[in-house]
Each structure stands twice: as C-alpha cells, then as structure tokens.
Regions:
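N-terminal Rossmann NAD(P)H-binding glycine-rich loop of SDR-like oxidoreductase domains
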Residues: 4-24
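SDR active-site strand-loop-helix element
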Residues: 9, 69-73, 110-116, 120, ...
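Adenosine-cofactor binding site in Rossmann-like domains, unifying the SAM/SAH pocket
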Residues: 27, 31-52
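NAD(P)H-binding glycine-rich loop region in Rossmannoid oxidoreductase-like domains
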Residues: 43-93, 102
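Conserved mid-core alpha-helix of short-chain dehydrogenase/reductase
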Residues: 48, 98-101, 149, 202
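Catalytic helix-loop patch of NAD(P)-dependent Rossmann-fold dehydrogenases
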Residues: 83, 90-98, 118-160, 164-165
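NAD(P)-dependent short-chain dehydrogenase/reductase
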Residues: 151-197, 201-202
Length: 207
C-alpha cells in the first residue's frame, strides 16, 4: 500500500486525532496537515481551502507519496442546527463543495465523512448504502447536501456514513454520560433509538 500524505479538515476532533496517530511520522509536514495542535482549516473559506489542497499536492509530489483529503470537519450540533440551518449548511454543504472543487483541480482524492442522519431514522433494519436518503432534520439535510456536493464535484471521491462516534479524545455521548453520572443522582436518556456505536480509532483505520 502506498504511503499517504493526509490533509484532514476537522483534525482537532475525535476522528482527526486518531488519523493523526496513523500518519507516517517520518514524512513530517507532508505526512499530516491540520493535526491536533495546529491551526484548524476553515473549509468555508474557498481560497484557504484551495491553497491548502494545493500545498498538500505539491508536498506529496516532492515526497513521492499519495495525497488524500479526509474531510472530518462538520457542524454537528444537531439541535442547534434547527435554529441556524444556514450556519450548518455553510460548513456541511458549502464547505464540502469547496473541498471538492479544490480536490478536483489538483486531482487529489477526497474522502468525505457523513452521517446516518441523511436517512429518515424510522427503519426496522440497518440501512444499506443504496437506501434512499430522507433526512428529517436540518443537520441531516445539510449533510446530504454535502454528500451530493462532494460526489458531484470530483470523480475521485468517496462518502463514508457513520454513526454514534466515540473516542479517547473530544466530546461524545459516552463522556457526557460519565460526567453527568458523577454530577447527578439519576439520569434520564431516550430509550427508543437504535444505532451503531463507532470507535473513532476503528473508523480511522478503516478510512
């Protein structure tokens, strides 16, 4: 398998941190960009995105490795998106479109991380990739728009839908429940949701 030079928007999150651990250390800056501790890439700024992808492509050529962009950046506040869908769209859809355009211009492959929220959520079996999307939330609508922008914007693109991601770093449901358990005598959580908890390190390795 060829060595990769990664650009990971959203590199400060759970998935980004695990991707950073998988990057070849000896490649230095060409091995991983926008890792924890570095400045985050603003995917809503098309010029900045174009410059970042161009720099990745050049560094990869100089190092003899394969450049790949993994988009882990997202507006993930599901409830808040209902009040500010425009902001969610700016990141989840327009930002994804900017990445797709930049990757197409440089012939850099793009892996876009999406969500099960693109489906209606009322099925009685696990969803298949071929099932028709039918988002019922602002978050889901903006993520579906991002998927379509990526797949329509560059031929060398893949969409990976995941759900209930948790990991060693960052905020997630598991950490929230552990914190609340220490603060409260009793906890109330929904009991009518079924999903696929996804360990972020496993997801990173799969990508």
């Amino acid at each position: 398998m060829p060595e990769l030079a990664l650009l990971v928007p959203g590199g400060h999150g759970q998935l980004g941190r695990d991707l950073a651990r998988l990057a070849p250390a000896h490649l230095g800056d060409a091995g991983f960009a926008h890792a924890p501790g570095s400045a985050e890439l603003d995917i809503t700024d098309a010029d900045t995105v174009r410059d970042a992808v161009g720099a990745l492509a050049e560094a990869a050529r100089n190092s003899g490795v394969v450049p790949v962009v993994v988009n882990a950046a997202a507006y993930t506040a599901v409830d808040a998106a209902e009040e500010d869908e425009a902001r969610a769209h700016e990141i989840n859809a327009a930002g994804a479109a900017a990445l797709a355009a930049a990757c197409a211009a440089e012939a850099v492959p793009l892996v876009h991380v999406s969500t099960d929220y693109v489906f209606a959520g009322d099925g009685d079996r696990p969803y298949e990739p071929s099932d028709p999307p039918a988002p019922r939330s602002a978050y889901g609508r903006t993520k579906l728009a991002g998927e379509r922008a990526v797949l329509g914007g560059t031929d060398r693109s893949w969409v990976v839908r995941t759900a209930w991601v948790y990991g060693a770093g960052g905020g997630n449901f598991v950490r929230t429940m552990a914190r609340l358990e220490r603060q409260r005598d009793t906890l109330s959580v929904v009991s009518d949701q079924v999903g696929s908890p996804t360990w972020s390190a496993d997801l990173a390795a799969g990508l």
